[in-house]
Amino acid sequence: NQVVTIHAKQVIDATELGDVFADAGVPYDLGMEASTISGENVGVEKSSDIIQDLTYTAILKDYGVGQDKTIAKPAGYDPSEFDGSCTDYYIDKSRKKPSVDSKKMLDYGKLPNNKYMINWPIYGNDIYLNLVEMDEAARQTALIKAKEQTLRFVYFIQHQLGYKHFGFA
């Protein structure tokens, strides 16, 4: 029950959510700064409160051609959500042109024993959330949304890209 005053030019919060200052009611700044502010050439045109994309990864296994491991169609599934994730499904030309085909996309997370970690940032299962500034109920709702996005992406891989033989490991 002691008050401690710390004078620092910069503090790095390395907790899971980076929410120590928010929880303590201390003024803070977070997110991506526009390159006009940071001076960095990273392509961030507009500042935002996004700190890091969140991904609920999935581990899929290749059960072999001829096997059908397709999951039930998730609620809210729309393949256009993942349009542009790879060259195999690129319809909306207003989106950035993908640089990889589905095989390379899946090989990004290839593991031993015919398993694949599904963790794809570009029109995949990454989701941008600011969990720091959410209350616990909103966080839980947002995390459910992230899990559902991964399920939809798995279904997209199976149904739209033809990897029906890839199922949960």
Give the location of each predicted region.
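Flavin (FAD/FMN)-binding glycine-rich loop and adjacent Rossmann-like elements that form
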Residues: 2-169
